[in-house]
UniProtKB/Swiss-Prot annotation:
Keywords: Arginine metabolism, Cytoplasm, Transferase. This is Ornithine carbamoyltransferase, catabolic. The keyword Repeat does not apply. Its main location: cytoplasm. The gene is arcB. It catalyses: carbamoyl phosphate + L-ornithine = L-citrulline + phosphate + H(+). GO terms for molecular function: amino acid binding; ornithine carbamoyltransferase activity.
Length: 30
């Protein structure tokens, strides 16, 4: 699971497309 509170959002640049898609899917579910 991703804990965005403990992540610097600038590190989104380091995420893989799969991880980005996963977070987008999570956001849609919320």
């Amino acid at each position: 699971a991703f804990n965005l509170r403990n992540r610097n959002f600038l590190k989104l640049l380091d995420f893989t497309p799969r991880e980005i898609q996963y977070m987008i899917d999570l956001a849609i579910d919320l």
